[in-house]
Amino acid sequence: MSEALKILNNIRTLRAQARECTLETLEEMLEKLEVVVNERREEESAAAAEVEERTRKLQQYREMLIADGIDPNELLNSLAAVKSGTKAKRAQRPAKYSYVDENGETKTWTGQGRTPAVIKKAMDEQGKSLDDFLIKQ
């Protein structure tokens, strides 16, 4: 809370500050404060009316579903099942390169991600290119 609001919220401090103002100034401040309070009340009542209207509409739709013989929980479950099943998995990329690691095992690499250390070392030290590791089809 800012210092100005702390002053307005404390009656003793407010009285002390009010002694330094004229009555006309205090009345002008009171009018402005009343305007602000009324605006806030209107905003809050409008928000409450929106919530009430939304709740009324939801209840109306629920009653329509029940009248048509549809259980609202069944509808939600079917929507959740459709939503969770929509994410399609993409196919795994085929291997593009083949190499022999330090243990003598033949391994493959798709060409995506970090270059395997064995391939990188061969390219740097032995002057090989990626084409040397291509899988021949």
Swiss-Prot record:
Entry annotated with the keyword Translocase: no
Effect upon mutating A95T: Derepression of proV expression
GO MF term set: bent DNA binding; DNA-binding transcription repressor activity; identical protein binding; minor groove of adenine-thymine-rich DNA binding; protein dimerization activity; RNA binding; structural constituent of chromatin; transcription cis-regulatory region binding
Pfam families the record matches: Histone_HNS, Histone_HNS_N
Record SUPFAM superfamilies: H-NS histone-like proteins
Biological processes, Gene Ontology terms: bacterial nucleoid packaging; negative regulation of DNA-templated transcription; negative regulation of single-species biofilm formation on inanimate substrate; regulation of DNA-templated transcription; regulation of translation
Disruption phenotype: Decreased growth below 30 degrees Celsius. Altered expression of a number of genes. Derepression of the cryptic blg operon. Alteration of chromosome organization. Double hns-stpA mutants grow slower and have reduced viable cell counts compared to single hns mutants in MC1029 and MC4100 backgrounds. In 0.3M NaCl a double hns-stpA deletion up-regulates 583 and down-regulates 86 genes, 363 of which are thought to have been horizontally acquired; 131 are also up-regulated in a double cnu-hha deletion. At 28 degrees Celsius csgD transcription is reduced.
SUBUNIT field: Homodimer, also found as tetramers or higher oligomers. Oligomerizes into higher-order complexes that form bridges between adjacent DNA helices. The N-terminal region (residues 1-64) can interact with overexpressed StpA. Forms a complex with Cnu (YdgT). The H-NS dimer forms a heterotrimeric complex with Hha in the absence of DNA; this is mediated by residues 1-46. Interacts with Hfq.
Annotated domain remarks: A central region (about residues 21-47) is involved in dimerization, but multimerization requires other residues. The dimerization domain (1-47) also acts as a hinge; changes in its structure probably impact oligomerization and DNA-binding geometries. The N-terminus also interacts with Hha, perhaps via residues 2-18; a well-folded dimer is not necessary for Hha binding. The C-terminus (residues 92-137) binds DNA. Residues in the N-terminus contribute to DNA-binding and to discrimination between curved and non-curved DNA.
Descriptive protein name: DNA-binding protein H-NS
